[in-house]
């Protein structure tokens, strides 16, 4: 085992604070409407230009191991805030730096670190309550647009397109962000349920312009196994032919003789059929087939529940108003499923989301909810260069998370006003002893840090602005973009309550750990003494004349 270096007490904490300051100073320049850019070198390609706090934080790795530990702990603050609310990473970093700096001064002055931590936790809990009390519901499109605009560094076009996407697909809908191919941002909304499996044979195409197979008012047959024998399908095909309606088959696969017969029947016009593979794999495939069944009013033909294809009847088929199959996807519009069954299925999936610990599973389950209850919107980002596109995509992702958080827990006045207003309400808060009260005081003093940083980045005098805002009431604050004072909500400067809350909780939690640190352990730096110098090799003279 390699030898370790151990540092104790104040010497350890000061090294840790240096690391905290390096990371936080790099991140906090991005805060506010007049936040600056940070340029990050990449091992290949052009450098990355960003105003996203968590992107900056993730890139920082320091040479000194003790300083690096401090930086990594603040990085954890940014990641935690990002995981909970998807935004507020810079605010969380600024708060953590302020609490740690004040806290370590108090520890150096002889205060009890554990009591300081209790005081900080008490202050954070009181401020969180105040934020909840200040919060107003975010229901109308204009408020959603304003939240998106603020979170995208005051880019109103981003706010507008996110608000439109939310309006089109509803709160349950899934909105994804992709890199587009033009200069302008585009919004594409998918009606109905879409999954990423297309037609199994190009011979099913009946619309040559769009190269798609379109079925009007079709029956839908769902099977959770491969279909290779056409005899299994004959009873269903005969029933569908008599009803003179098209048929969509979704199965694990349709191959060989079965697929060939379906193609021939379609080309001759006997029965209009299209077939697609079921989406997903394994258990997820079964779940998604069940979703399609609920949406279309079908029964999944599965041997697990004692149903076989040979005995299937038209009653077990679903229906929809329209189905479109392209090479890559299948879209079912207006399935004839029972509304109560769809609602209960959505509730069931939501319960699974609540119980799931995997982010990937949660994302996939949320997509299923969207396909059943809402819709799917895709925002395609446009920009002049790839660099600008990457930077804009990061901002749109942030703005999207912020608007979701706003819809969830409402909005508060932005620009750091909510925290300043909360601390003026609980200025009389006291701890059980003097050290706890000091912890409360230093945490409340740190609540001003985000507003101070926004004002500094805008080139104004922080102390003057903070004092003036403290004297005001309600949503009165400072608009750093214009340099004016006024009602923040009326000026459209809003922050999601969830973002402000999670930033504060993450900062207080990690700052408390750092203040109560008494020893730090790291590997000793390796002594990289090179190989001894081999000296020059003698000349190879005297070899002339060798022809």
Swiss-Prot record:
InterPro entries: Chaperonin_Cpn60_CS (IPR018370), Cpn60/GroEL (IPR001844), Cpn60/GroEL/TCP-1 (IPR002423), GroEL-like_apical_dom_sf (IPR027409), GROEL-like_equatorial_sf (IPR027413), TCP-1-like_intermed_sf (IPR027410). Keywords: ATP-binding, Chaperone, Cytoplasm, Isomerase, Nucleotide-binding. ATP binds at residues 30-33, 51, 87-91, 415, 479-481, 495. One of its GO terms (biological process) is protein refolding. Transmembrane segments: none annotated. Its EC number is 5.6.1.7. It is found in: Cytoplasm. It holds the Pfam family Cpn60_TCP1. GO terms for molecular function: ATP binding; ATP-dependent protein folding chaperone; isomerase activity; unfolded protein binding. One of its GO terms (cellular component) is cytoplasm. Its main location: cytoplasm. The keyword Chaperone applies. It catalyses: ATP + H2O + a folded polypeptide = ADP + phosphate + an unfolded polypeptide. Forms a cylinder of 14 subunits composed of two heptameric rings stacked back-to-back. Interacts with the co-chaperonin GroES. Together with its co-chaperonin GroES, plays an essential role in assisting protein folding. The GroEL-GroES system forms a nano-cage that allows encapsulation of the non-native substrate proteins and provides a physical environment optimized to promote and accelerate protein folding. Belongs to the chaperonin (HSP60) family. NCBIfam families: GroEL, PRK00013.1, PRK12849.1, PRK12850.1, PRK12851.1. This is Chaperonin GroEL.
